A protein has these predicted regions:
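Conserved interdomain linker/interface between the two RecA-like ATPase lobes of SF2 helicase motors
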Residues: 145-157, 162-244, 273-282, 366
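Conserved C-terminal RecA-like helicase domain
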Residues: 60, 65-70, 74-80, 84-92, ...
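Walker A/P-loop NTP-binding motif
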Residues: 28-36, 44-62, 82, 144, ...
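Inter-Walker segment of RecA-like/P-loop motor cores
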Residues: 77-122, 181-187, 194-197
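Conserved segment of the helicase C-terminal RecA-like domain
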Residues: 154, 317, 321-377
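SF2 helicase catalytic motif II
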Residues: 110-113, 117-157
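Helicase-associated low-complexity/disordered flanking segments
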Residues: 1-37, 57-58, 63-65, 190, ...
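Long, largely alpha-helical accessory region at the distal end of helicase-like NTP-driven motors
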Residues: 373-435
Length: 435
């Protein structure tokens, strides 16, 4: 009798999710009408707050919308597919894809909502994931405007684990007339430890003695895999992937078993998968990235993944160990230093909740150390964006509002301790000072 029951329930897993106290507090604050800034490490469960609000039917109200904004198109696509699989009525808006834009839940890159914010419109709930982007030189203004122009009846949920001054952001929002709570935790779900490459086992044959051979073999012999390596640019990511693959046996190759997927993958990816290795960068095709590399990485089927640092914010899977190769990375035509906050985000991918007791940061002689990672205080980098200002003034004029008053109001709502000069004097102001 008991044996039959055992067989009947064989392979059945019951997963009971009990929210942490800080998650419960954030959910309660939002339903009580507060905006919430969540300060919690990568992997702690910040997205759970949004998912709980939707599943509990607390947001959005009938006829309104909840918008979850993310910094990359890849991440938007991933969350959209995930929530559709869960049965949600969810749309997507990115620079290259727009579907079901009026769905109760919308996943979007923040820039796609720009006109909505400028028109003074807003959803019932607006989530700004990775809100540290406010400090980004290129994209920060759009993030700043989303907060500055959100209507009073839009609840804001700001998520990050790499901001050092969330209290200052809260004070700015309070200056805008909003009720705000800062909620979070400093505790990581999986603690991190640092392991120098020199401390890993060395038993490679003489011809396999370069750094990448030692790293890949040492990590596998120590059972510290899967390993995620962050590389400075695409070519480096691919080169490193081939180097680490040289040391690994082809004893358990991944076979996709789907002709469509195999045809959608390059020969390089298919060859690397035989060693359970892959690279991950913006040059991958949609099928390669979204249907092959990312799902395999999430499922723990890859030994080593080599990703570009520029895509760090778009990575949504965890591994046991992380290694950051270099201190600079390619950002479009520019080379940028890796910031301490970016390191914090990359290192945060080490340690899988429920699988690992410890996550490992592998360090080399010239690579980033765990102590190099820390939150950074946010400050605005942008000067005024005049196309945005002129658009705001034009919309104000169409509604019978003084364009100059609209410009001043927008200026005064920016994330700045000092008044940003507009540099014009409206007609009729006589000898008054330039605004």
């Amino acid at each position: 009798m008991h044996g039959g029951l055992d067989r009947a329930f064989e392979g059945l897993q019951v997963r009971l999710l009990v929210p942490d106290l800080w998650q419960q507090e954030a959910i309660r604050a939002l339903t009580d009408g507060f905006d919430v800034i969540v300060d919690a490490p990568t992997g702690a469960g910040k997205t759970y707050i949004f998912e709980s609000l939707i599943k509990g039917r607390k947001f959005p109200a009938a006829g309104r919308q909840a918008i979850f904004t993310v910094p990359t198109r890849a991440l938007a696509n991933e969350k959209w597919r995930e929530w559709k699989r869960d049965g949600w009525k969810v749309g997507i808006a990115t620079g290259d894809l727009a579907e079901d834009l009026d769905a109760p839940v919308l996943v979007a890159t923040l820039e796609t909502q720009r006109e909505r914010f400028l028109a003074g419109e807003g959803p019932h709930l607006l989530v700004i994931d990775e809100y540290q982007m406010i400090g980004d030189r290129q994209r920060g203004l759009n993030y700043e405007l989303a907060v500055a122009l959100a209507p009073p009846d839009t609840r804001l949920l700001l998520l990050s684990g790499s901001v050092g001054n969330p209290g200052k952001v809260a004070a700015w929002m309070e200056r805008l007339g909003r009720r705000v709570r800062v909620i979070g935790t400093a505790e990581r779900p999986v603690p991190l430890d640092e392991m120098p490459v020199e401390g890993l086992p060395r038993s490679a044959p003489p011809k396999y003695r370069n750094f990448w051979h030692r790293l890949s073999l040492g990590v596998m012999l120590s059972h510290y895999g899967p390993l995620l390596i962050f590389a400075p640019h695409r070519k480096a990511a691919e080169k490193i992937a081939w180097k680490v693959a040289e040391m690994l046996p082809e004893d358990d190759p991944i076979r996709l078993g789907d002709r469509r997927l195999e045809q959608g993958c390059s020969a390089d990816i298919l060859r690397l998968l035989k060693k359970r290795v892959a690279f991950h960068h913006s040059g991958l095709g949609f099928l390669e990235r979204a249907a092959v590399v990312e799902p395999l990485a999430k499922a723990g089927q890859l030994r080593i993944i080599v990703a570009t640092m520029g895509l760090a914010a778009g990575i949504n899977f965890s591994v046991r160990s992380v290694f950051v190769a270099g201190t600079t990375y390619q950002d479009g035509p520019y080379e940028r230093d890796v910031s301490p906050a970016e390191l914090l985000q990359m290192f945060g991918r080490a340690g899988r909740r429920g699988l690992d007791e410890t996550g490992y940061i592998i360090s080399g002689r010239d690579s980033a150390r765990l102590s190099d990672a820390r939150p950074l205080d946010l400050r605005r980098h942008n000067e005024l964006d005049w196309p945005t200002m002129i658009r705001r003034m034009h919309l104000a004029g169409e509604h019978g509002v003084s364009p100059f008053d609209a410009a001043r109001e927008l200026r005064d709502r920016l994330f700045s301790d000092q008044t940003v000069p507009l540099g014009f004097r409206p007609a009729g102001d006589g000898d008054s000072a330039t605004t």
